[in-house]
Amino acid sequence: MRVVAGAFKGRTLQAPRGQRTRPTADRVREAVFSMLGSVDGLRVLDLFAGSGALAIEALSRGAAEAVLVERDPRALAAIQRNLDATGAALVAY
């Protein structure tokens, strides 16, 4: 799994282990963002974030802020690793 476009293009993203999380495929994210158009300056909400790929893709494409909601500890660890790999800031509540 990788970031499709933007500032983090080509960066590899990790998915949480196990079968409780099913990451959105690269092609699906690419299609979603093609339909959405520009996300520059927008705020993004990623519910049931899993790997955080959707939010990270949005940040890569210029979104101003992303809020990720996830309760699975393994998924949270994957999100943290993915944010660290891209250099995106994390503020946790």
Regions found by a protein language model. Name each.
Residues 1-93:
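Class I S-adenosyl-L-methionine-dependent methyltransferase catalytic core
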